[in-house]
């Protein structure tokens, strides 16, 4: 008899719970895809896919609210129809009648924890893959709508175009602007450009091959015209580079190896490249200051470059050579007494040379870019001469490899340590100091976010039980009122818990505060809700 009664109550709960879940999910799912539609310009075909992928995020909030509504409504009706009084008169205790509601609350709490820690991040990654697969359409659609597009995630490159043709992947009347630190680094204008995407696991690489181009740089850069020019940029993550979209095992991996989190890995590689540049600049400065032999040598597989310069100054991942610059490019065999000199260049009064890292930051090559130089053999003036594929000197590589593990991964902690920075005799440049400080902040923030995210998911999942049980109790207490009055009253303690979670999470993630206070606030909200539920049921069971 008791099992039949409980099954009846549970069935009544499901009759309200399931339609409520479906209705709320449909409404909130439509709201959840508005941002991707507005920001990324996804097409109609992808809208249904995104609704499916964002479903676990929606269910995380819908399931507790639907169970709260069902519990307050069903038990309020049972109490209003005196069915609970009939059960008591038959010797069935209130605790026995409440068991179906408790079972639903526990099921919802377990589902919420599984959704938050495991399922929701997987579906967000699927949504990310879906958006990446449609990256070309997103770019062209945004250019057609605005008519410009900022390449995510940092908006470093802005692409403007008068006309976009997605059928043959071309843009007409193109302007590509590179912005760094709120400063325009360069502007490239082109008659037309072809856009291609090279997909990878972490990001898509966008290659823009421009035709009839003019490049305008900052004050210290040379302006020039080129028939063809290729620009490669990163089309980064749209959704997943956020701790709140990580699974529990991913967060644990990030905590043990910080380079598993792409924003940290990317910034650490930039800092590593800047550190390598400054080490190279230090080595060049020491060599060209040597009065006995002031020639600096760089090698590649097939050639060798020797150069002298008046001075070498370090910049943002580049070294600027100035003064009287003389560059000799020769076959590698020439250094052994065979072969021949390929070219000897000497800069004019307005000339200069740049030496910068190219390719993979962890295993880079060097490129020398020489401006306004005259060929000694012929007297011809070269406005620009580029030598690529030079190898980082062994003196520099010996030090930089100490920052890598045997697998080639960066040791971030060593990179940002003050002790290792003493290798640079003149200290770190403002660029390297800024990168290190930024890296320290993002590491601290990431670790704080991981801690706050884990605790917030736990508190909200466990709190679902107390939240739903309070709704059931208030439904019984307010049996003489409106059917929705109990639901409205039970939303108040639920709102208190949510406010405590959001406030605690914000405090825990704030680097200027003690994050333990935010964690305590979250669990204090759960303790308040649990004590309130215990007090209400103590009163109900007593009478």
Q: Where is each model-derived feature located?
A:
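Transmembrane alpha-helices
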Residues: 1-188, 194-347, 354-369, 374-543
């Amino acid at each position: 008899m008791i099992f039949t009664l409980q099954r009846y109550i549970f069935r009544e709960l499901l009759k309200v719970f399931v339609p409520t879940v479906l209705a709320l999910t449909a409404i909130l799912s439509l709201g959840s895809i508005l941002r991707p539609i507005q920001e990324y310009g996804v097409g109609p075909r992808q809208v249904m896919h995104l609704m499916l992928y964002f479903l676990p995020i929606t269910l995380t909030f819908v399931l507790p609210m639907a169970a709260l509504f069902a519990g307050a409504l069903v038990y309020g009706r049972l109490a209003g129809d005196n069915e609970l009084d009939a059960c008591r008169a038959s010797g069935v205790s209130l605790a026995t009648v409440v068991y179906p509601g408790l079972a639903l609350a526990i099921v919802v709490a377990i589902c919420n924890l599984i959704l938050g820690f495991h399922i929701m991040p997987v579906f967000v990654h699927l949504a990310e893959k879906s958006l990446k697969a449609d990256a070309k359409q997103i770019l062209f659609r945004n250019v057609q709508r605005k008519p410009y597009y900022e390449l995510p995630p940092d908006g470093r490159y802005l692409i403007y175009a008068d006309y976009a043709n997605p059928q043959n992947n071309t843009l007409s009347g193109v302007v590509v602007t590179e912005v760094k630190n709120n400063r325009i680094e360069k502007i490239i204008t082109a008659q037309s450009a072809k856009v291609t995407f090279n997909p990878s696991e972490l990001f898509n690489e966008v290659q823009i091959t421009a035709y009839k181009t003019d490049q305008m740089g900052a004050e210290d850069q040379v302006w020039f015209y080129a028939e063809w020019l290729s620009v490669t940029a990163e089309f980064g993550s749209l959704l997943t580079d956020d701790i709140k979209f990580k699974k529990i095992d991913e967060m644990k991996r990030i905590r043990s190896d910080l380079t598993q989190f792409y924003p940290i890995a990317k910034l650490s590689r930039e800092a590593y490249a800047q550190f390598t540049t400054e080490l190279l600049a230090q080595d060049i400065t020491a060599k060209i200051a040597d009065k006995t032999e002031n020639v600096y040598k760089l090698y590649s597989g097939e050639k060798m470059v020797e150069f002298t310069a008046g001075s070498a100054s370090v910049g943002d991942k580049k070294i600027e050579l100035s003064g009287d610059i003389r560059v000799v490019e020769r076959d590698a065999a020439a250094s052994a007494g065979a072969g021949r000199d390929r070219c000897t260049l000497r800069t004019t009064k307005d000339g200069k040379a740049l030496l910068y890292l190219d390719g993979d930051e962890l295993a880079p090559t060097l490129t020398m870019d020489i401006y306004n130089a005259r060929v000694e053999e012929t007297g011809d003036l070269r406005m620009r001469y580029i030598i690529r594929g030079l190898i980082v000197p062994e003196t520099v590589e010996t030090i930089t490899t100490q920052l890598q593990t045997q697998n080639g991964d960066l040791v971030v902690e060593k990179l940002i340590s003050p002790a290792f920075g003493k290798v640079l005799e003149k200290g770190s440049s403002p660029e390297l100091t800024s990168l290190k400080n930024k890296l320290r902040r993002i590491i601290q923030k990431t670790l704080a976010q991981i801690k706050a995210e884990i605790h917030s998911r736990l508190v909200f999942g466990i709190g679902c039980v107390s939240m739903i049980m309070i709704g059931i109790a208030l439904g019984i207490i307010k049996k003489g009122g409106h059917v929705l009055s109990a639901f409205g009253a039970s939303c108040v303690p639920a709102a208190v818990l949510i406010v405590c979670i959001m406030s605690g999470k914000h405090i825990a993630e704030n680097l200027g505060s003690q994050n333990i206070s935010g964690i305590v606030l979250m669990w204090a909200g759960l303790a308040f809700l649990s004590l309130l539920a215990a007090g209400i049921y103590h009163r109900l069971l007593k009478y």
